[in-house]
Each structure stands twice: as C-alpha cells, then as structure tokens.
C-alpha cells in the first residue's frame, strides 16, 4: 500500500526497472499481469511515462562512488542491529555445542511432525499411497505443492495397478491431467514437436475419461522457476517411477542396506535414478531447445529435499509402527548426518535475524537447516517483525543456564 502526495492510499503491485522506458520495452503495457501496478520504480527517468514513477538516482543519501565502496565493505554484509530478532543476543551466548543440540532437538521435532502426517494419511490410504503422495508433493517445489499433491491423489486412476500403462502413456496422462500439454506444436523445435505429437496421440484417446479431474493450466505457478524445477520435468520423472512400480521397494532396500556413512546420500540418489529418457535428458520443457549436454531428471539437491522432507520421515514412522527400534535409530542417524541442502530465502532471513548474519558452524547439515526452519515455524511464524510476545528468547536463556 502506498500514498502519493495527498492522494488517498492505494494498494497494488510495484514494478522495478532500470528506466521508465522499460515499461513498454518489456511489454508490461500489454501484459494483463501488470494491470495492478500502482508504482513504477526506476533508476533513471527518461522520456514520457504513463503511470506514477519513482526515480531513485536523485534521492540517494550518498554519492554513488561512496555507495559502491560501502557495498564491498564488512559493514554492508552485517545485518542492521535494529532488525535483529530478540533471540539474537541470547543465541550468541550459546556455545557451538549448545546451539547444535538446540537445532538438533528442533530438527527431531520436525522429523516427528512430518512422520505423523504420513502416519495419519496412511490410516486412510495405506503406506504405499501415502509415500506416492509425499513424493509428488516433494517435487512440487514451493510454488506448486497443491497441484502436484492432487496428481498424487489421482495415482490409482492415472496408473491402475491391474493394468499398468506404458511410460509414454503415463507421461501423457500426467501432463494431460495437469493441464500442461501445449495445444499446438511449436513449428520451430522438431524434436519437441515430434515428442509432443506422440503424447497427444496417446492423450486424445483418453482425455474424456479424465475430463472430471483435469486441471486448468492456471493452477500452476511458473514465476521464478528454474528450468530444472519445471513441473513438466517433474511429472516426466514421476512417470518413470510409476511405470517401474518399485519405488517403495527401492527405498526400503536402501534403508536396510549396509552403506558407508559417506555414501548414504549418493546411494539414495542412485536408488532414485531412472533409465535414460531420450527426450527429457535433452530438454528442460516441452517447448525448449535441445540441450548441449544431458541433464538428469533428478539431481543431488532435489534428492536431499526429498530425503529430509519425505523419504526419511516415511521410513522412520514405518520403523516406529513396526516397533523396530534399531532401524528407527539408524534412520535418525542418517537424518542427522545428511549433508546440507540448498539454501533458501527463509533460511537466509532466519540466519540474519537470529544470528546477525554471522557464520554458524552448527548449520552444516540438512538436519540443522530443518531445525532452524522449525524454530521459524514454531516461534517467528506466531509473532511479528518486532518479536512481540515471542517466547523463544526466554527459552534460549533458560537453555543457556
């Protein structure tokens, strides 16, 4: 919400560009996604402009040369003291061992919480289906969790066990039900058009059968997605796992096998790998050009996310349900030893507000990251930006004593 002069406050979007002429140069003027923009923020004005514009260059509080020097200094990398969380000071009083133990306990709570969700879902649909739904959701990344989960719920319709479809048919069904099959050929990418035509040859015969559960494309959020995380690629991967039908068996074999600790993450990735896919190994999407080098449908980063959020919690609660204490302890050991995953905006902000941006030796594992996320969920998520009535600072002080 912004207020311009004495005008009434307005609520809407803010677009940032280098210069105001970029509004037309980038096609914003004809893009309906930009119809709610109420302010155009630019570095320099130039020429005419059609909406309220804020030019930044004239309002710098220091010369640009001084700001360039400051940007490379230690001061620029430190988080402003007034923005630190109230827990930052007591957290700094903890030793490295105490901090690691605090994050470890938070990570265990997160593991148990995710495991409980699998347990509750398994009571309704069984362990196998709960795993499939979790894997679909895990590949939805942060923007497309719900549509991916919905596809997981439709597994028995898309891939009936009594009559398993072929890999191509599965890819066509998943992409078709998801609403992600382009209606027209590109007429520019021969390999993409050939594969798309094969998908449609399969899908057009079945689309009426799935009409009641086919999703609109508008459900999917593509903003800011890396090519490797595109839902079309994720569904191509899921089709391979469904076609083989041995996902739970593979994971259970990995869980009970004797593996050197240093190779646990790499062997899980190997267990999840699929045969070569002639199209998807060389394309990011159904519209993309041929890639120069082959790209796996599943990489180490996404495998780590699946491990700590889906696979290990599912295996852990299975061990608990089966009263297999030794297996439960082994799964916990793997969970706490798992290498750290990809950084994200929530973790970055949490490190800045809770630790002042200082390097923390206790954040070198995926479990430590999970522990920090649990702290954010349990405390920061129930307070405000100034930490009103947050109980975490007092808990940390009590921990230190």
Language-model segment annotations:
Residues 103-371:
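Hydrophobic, aromatic-lined core segments that form the binding pocket/scaffold
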Residues 21-29:
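Active-site-adjacent loop/helix micro-motif of nuclease/hydrolase catalytic cores
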Residues 2-13:
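Active-site beta-strand-loop-beta-strand hairpin of nuclease catalytic cores
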Residues 11-19, 40-42:
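Active-site ExK catalytic segment of metal-dependent nucleases
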Residues 33, 37-98:
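Compact, glycine/acidic-enriched structural inserts
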Residues 355-401:
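Acidic, carboxylate-rich catalytic segments that either coordinate divalent cations
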Residues 20-22, 45-47, 60-62, 141, ...:
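Short loop/turn segments at secondary-structure transitions that flank enzyme active sites
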């Amino acid at each position: 919400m912004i207020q311009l002069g004495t005008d009434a406050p307005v609520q809407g979007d803010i677009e940032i560009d280098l210069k105001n002429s970029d509004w037309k140069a980038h096609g914003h003027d004809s893009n309906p996604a930009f119809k709610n923009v109420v302010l155009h923020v630019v570095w320099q004005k130039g020429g005419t402009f059609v909406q309220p514009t804020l030019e930044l260059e004239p309002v710098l509080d220091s010369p640009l040369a001084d700001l360039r020097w400051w940007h490379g200094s230690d001061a620029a990398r430190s988080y402003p003291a007034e923005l630190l969380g109230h827990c930052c000071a007591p957290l700094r009083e903890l030793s490295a061992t105490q901090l690691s133990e605090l994050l470890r306990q938070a990570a265990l709570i997160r593991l148990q919480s995710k495991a409980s969700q699998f347990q509750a879902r398994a009571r309704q649909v069984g362990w196998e289906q709960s795993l499939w739904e979790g894997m679909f959701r895990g590949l939805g990344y942060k923007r497309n969790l719900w549509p991916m989960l919905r596809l997981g719920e439709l597994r028995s319709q898309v891939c009936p066990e009594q009559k398993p479809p072929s890999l191509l048919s599965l890819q066509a069904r998943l992409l078709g039900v998801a609403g992600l099959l382009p209606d027209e050929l590109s007429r520019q990418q021969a390999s993409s058009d050939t594969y798309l035509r094969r998908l449609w040859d399969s899908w057009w015969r079945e689309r009426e059968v799935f009409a009641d559960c086919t999703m609109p494309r508008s459900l999917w959020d593509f903003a800011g997605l890396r090519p490797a995380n595109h839902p079309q690629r994720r569904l191509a991967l899921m089709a391979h796992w469904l076609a083989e039908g041995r996902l739970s068996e593979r994971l259970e074999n990995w869980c009970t096998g004797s593996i050197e600790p240093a190779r646990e993450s790499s062997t899980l990735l190997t267990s999840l790998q699929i045969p070569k896919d002639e199209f998807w190994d060389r394309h990011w999407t159904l519209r993309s050009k041929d890639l120069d080098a082959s790209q796996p449908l599943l990489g180490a980063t996404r495998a780590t996310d699946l491990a700590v959020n889906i696979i290990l919690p599912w295996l852990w609660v299975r061990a608990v349900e089966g009263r297999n204490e030794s297996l439960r302890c082994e799964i916990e050991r793997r969970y706490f030893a798992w290498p750290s995953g990809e950084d994200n905006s929530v973790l970055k902000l949490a490190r800045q507000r809770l630790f002042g941006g200082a390097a923390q030796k206790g954040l070198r594992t995926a479990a430590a990251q999970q522990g920090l996320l649990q702290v954010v969920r349990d405390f920061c998520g129930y307070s405000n930006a100034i930490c009103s009535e947050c109980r975490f600072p007092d808990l940390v002080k009590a921990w230190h004593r």
